[in-house]
Amino acid sequence: MELLTFRDVAIEFSPEEWKCLDPDQQNLYRDVMLENYRNLVSLGVAISNPDLVTCLEQRKEPYNVKIHKIVARPPAMCSHFTQDHWPVQGIEDSFHKLILRRYEKCGHDNLQLRKGCKSLNECKLQKGGYNEFNECLSTTQSKILQCKASVKVVSKFSNSNKRKTRHTGEKHFKECGKSFQKFSHLTQHKVIHAGEKPYTCEECGKAFKWSLIFNEHKRIHTGEKPFTCEECGSIFTTSSHFAKHKIIHTGEKPYKCEECGKAFNRFTTLTKHKRIHAGEKPITCEECRKIFTSSSNFAKHKRIHTGEKPYKCEECGKAFNRSTTLTKHKRIHTGEKPYTCEECGKAFRQSSKLNEHKKVHTGERPYKCDECGKAFGRSRVLNEHKKIHTGEKPYKCEECGKAFRRSTDRSQHKKIHSADKPYKCKECDKAFKQFSLLSQHKKIHTVDKPYKCKDCDKAFKRFSHLNKHKKIHT
């Protein structure tokens, strides 16, 4: 049996080439080489050059060990056996399966594989690939196509303005014929056709196709917001939202209209703008004259006027005109409160309610009434307050004709006319017509007093009680 060396099973780099690989690719190289070594030893093949094996096991740079003089070839990652150096029957298949398994498992973006080769120059695991003139191709010049039997690489190149293609017999992905440069992208794409959603949220049961989107979704339940803006301190759940936000501070407008040259900081804004050039007219609501650029948004808006409420709660039968509103409503029944105040530990069902609550601790009241100078922490409360000065009561009860300044007051009033008490206390089974009354009632069972007076440190269960108390100090 001929003695094998690591020159015969060679993956070779210069120091400069090694530095071009990212850590994942370096780790893949080490793992493949060591597994090759172990497989050969297990088959009784004598292996020379133990220094390289030791170097790999200690995770040192492989170019520190002199395997042999580096041959003059383009900078690439090459792994090969020659036809003459297969000492044991079946080891060739074993080698191919090993590399293919490693490749498919790790899904490294810019490593490409060819199978079924018989000579030294035919079988390569490489970056980008070579053409038939042994010229190195960039990864953008290669496409991984899905064949029914195996994964193959087609390397396309140009020479003297002639287009040539290697490795015939390839088959595109049969579902749609789409091809990909990256094996991981192909794997992800196939999920679309399969309709598969393997990632299911244990909290709400929602399923996702991609692990990345699933992980971002889980942060809704945990309240985690790992992305913080250094400019303004805003925090975000997803990296995509954070990236969009940063453009506000930089003034960057990366999305440019090819028709007129106008630039935008968001792709969605560019899409809306393009409708002007396409001759698409904005949609105007005949009821309130509000203008919409999206037909889907207009369809949602029309439900306000028609009273259509297609999203119904299975627990209590209450219906809503938006799916997001139904999702928020369901938390009443589940008791879920994913948004927690870091100051006092109070939890909320909606992030907007948490943001409003935070102003209790900061004392911030940015919204001021021009009529009386009174300030408010929420713009909505200011708008409702203004109706005191105007005397406006736009919300009228259809049952008795009584009018109200706020729609919430009318909604609460309408429950007088019905015997329905949908809000039930889990502690004592007492039921209430209004959710606010249930919230007040629940404080009987707890000692929670979140509203604290800054002047005397006295605490109260209700914010209204704190306001009454403050008058003592003034």
Swiss-Prot record:
Residues 4-75 form the KRAB domain. One of its GO terms (cellular component) is nucleus. CDD domains: KRAB_A-box. Keywords: Developmental protein, Disease variant, DNA-binding, Metal-binding, Nucleus, Repeat, Repressor, Transcription, Transcription regulation, Zinc, Zinc-finger. The keyword Cell inner membrane does not apply. Pfam families: KRAB, zf-C2H2, zf-C2H2_6. One of its GO terms (biological process) is negative regulation of transcription by RNA polymerase II. Its main location: nucleus. InterPro entries: KRAB (IPR001909), KRAB_dom_sf (IPR036051), Znf_C2H2_sf (IPR036236), Znf_C2H2_type (IPR013087). GO terms for molecular function: DNA-binding transcription factor activity, RNA polymerase II-specific; RNA polymerase II cis-regulatory region sequence-specific DNA binding; zinc ion binding. It is found in: Nucleus. It is linked to Polydactyly, postaxial A6: A condition characterized by the occurrence of supernumerary digits in the upper and/or lower extremities. In postaxial polydactyly type A, the extra digit is well-formed and articulates with the fifth or a sixth metacarpal/metatarsal. May be involved in transcriptional regulation as a repressor. Plays a role in limb development. Belongs to the krueppel C2H2-type zinc-finger protein family. This is Zinc finger protein 141. The gene is ZNF141.
